[in-house]
Amino acid sequence: MQSLTPSSSGINIKLLNRKKIQTHRVTPSRVVIKCVYRFDSVNAGAAAVNTGVVNTPASNNTAGHVGASRTDWQSSCAILASKVVSQQQDTEKSGGAGNITAVNGHKILNLDLLPVESNRAKPLTITDLSPAPMHGAQLRVAYQGVPGAYSEAAAGKAYPKCEAIPCDQFEVAFQAVELWIADRAVLPIENSLGGSIHRNYDLLLRHRLHIVGEVQLPVHHCLLALPGVRKEYLTRVISHPQALAQCELTLTKLGLNVAREAVDDTAGAAEYIAANNLRDTAAIASSRAAELYGLDILEQGIQDDLSNVTRFVMLAREPIIPRTDRPFKTSIVFAHDKGTSVLFKVLSAFAFRNISLTKIESRPHRNRPIRLVDDANVGTAKHFEYMFYVDFEASMADVRAQNALAEVQEFTSFLRVLGSYPMDMTPWSPSRDA
């Protein structure tokens, strides 16, 4: 018997030896819906016998719900502990288990979800911890969003035969790999139109995962709505903030001077419209999302530039061994020390060795947000403190890269290699069918 205790929750789960069991699938709820599972007494008893899960007093909030077997982790509708806590806080603020404020301020009643059969992947749950796959088992890859998201397509491109695991937040995908729920995570890091995904840069520093690869995915946006809805009926458009930014000019050219509201992900916007029968709202998402959620495509290729590409990074618990027989890229993060022209000196370490930089991104140093002029001027900010993220074209197996980082370390108070990994050299061209 093996006991797994995730650090992010007080739930103690005991898993017995695996065996093939018969389980029920349940329809997933979105983040904005408070879910309650309802089983009849026969099903509840059968689930307890089949799964062999021992519920402890610390796991009362999972008692009588979906079991914690490996099959169930893909079928559950709960979320990781961070979201459970935030959901409880929302309930306390609202004064009880009444109506819950959902996306864009709409009210949604609590739902009792009955077990139904569905082939669609289900969100993760903290009760679904299971050991890493045995040798030869299918690779499990976490991505942010729901089925139909561009991140799901990127996961399929990076690992063609993987089992994609949807996560409701970027941080949940990081936690899924750290807790051995998933073997890899594929997350967006930058877009050719919308720029950097700052949230993921911050998470790369907070978590100890390693970048083991990258994949570039051409993004083809569509305007989706319920069947029968016309563009002139629309009063708002919802999607991920990056998607809204990537389609801003095109929406204006289409005469859609409507409210534009941000949600967690593109496919989630399509799912939200379908689930709530919103006939005055359109979503910006992929054509696959239209197929999955029964929406019509009002316009195709609405991104402002057909050469719209998102770069994703592949994350793992352990780094890969760098090589020199193919193009490699290395990602680092550092905080420069006090002194004049420090950033220039750091960048010169690469220039003197003919190492090309492909990206440099600055993010505020959270532990030291500002630097003061002197003790006599307390409260006067001289300048902000920053962390710098740099990508350069060289492998850590290359002596030039090793010497460059040795020199960089002389001028920095903090330096960390996020990963040294093969570059995505797959050729692509702008296409309306991407």
From Swiss-Prot:
One of its GO terms (cellular component) is chloroplast. Residues 140-317 form the Prephenate dehydratase domain. It is found in: Plastid, Chloroplast stroma. It comes from Petunia hybrida. Keywords: Amino-acid biosynthesis, Aromatic amino acid biosynthesis, Chloroplast, Lyase, Phenylalanine biosynthesis, Plastid, Transit peptide. It catalyses: prephenate + H(+) = 3-phenylpyruvate + CO2 + H2O; L-arogenate + H(+) = L-phenylalanine + CO2 + H2O. Pathway: Amino-acid biosynthesis; L-phenylalanine biosynthesis; L-phenylalanine from L-arogenate: step 1/1. This is Arogenate dehydratase 3. PANTHER family: PREPHENATE DEHYDRATASE P PROTEIN (PTHR21022), PREPHENATE DEHYDRATASE-RELATED (PTHR21022:SF19). GO terms for biological process: L-phenylalanine biosynthetic process. The lineage of its organism: Eukaryota, Viridiplantae, Streptophyta, Embryophyta, Tracheophyta. Converts the prephenate and L-arogenate produced from the shikimate-chorismate pathway into 3-phenylpyruvate and phenylalanine (Phe), respectively. Involved in floral volatile benzenoids and phenylpropanoids (FVBP) production. Residues 1-43 form a transit peptide. Signal peptide: none annotated. It holds the Pfam family PDT. GO terms for molecular function: arogenate dehydratase activity; prephenate dehydratase activity. Its EC number is 4.2.1.91, 4.2.1.51. Expressed at low levels in petals (corollas and tubes), stems, leaves, pistils, stamens, ovaries and sepals. Residues 331-422 form the ACT domain.
